[in-house]
């Protein structure tokens, strides 16, 4: 549970989480349940593997607060039933966020590119092979075809997060196909 203000936090490449719980609650790449907290300038590259029923999000599991200038580029594998969203499992307000999370599960898993539940989003996008539904009552235009298409959104995403203290820059490193945009302090 988080009611905190989380800024500039990250979970990097070599972290893996294996879930064998009872299907209650929610798990996320950074926060399991965000209860009226704020998450800004954060990212997760975590791999989550769930062997039992799960509700999971690439960055946040259950979300009731604002998430701004943040992204998820990990992987969620659901081997039982449940709901998985590339960015959040459900809820809250998302501004200037993206997900390139690899999402997979059994036939009894609901998989959505951004969120499986109701969510409010502004300038949020996802890129995931085999997943076409953004979820959360969001338009299908939130799906981008590749890293170049996401990079084309950088100006509008930065405009949406202006004043947050963070901005996106293009990633020119070797992992740019998976993480096309990096978040950094806006100084």
Predicted feature descriptions by range:
Residues 1-187:
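Predominantly extracellular beta-rich ligand-binding scaffolds that present long acidic/polar faces
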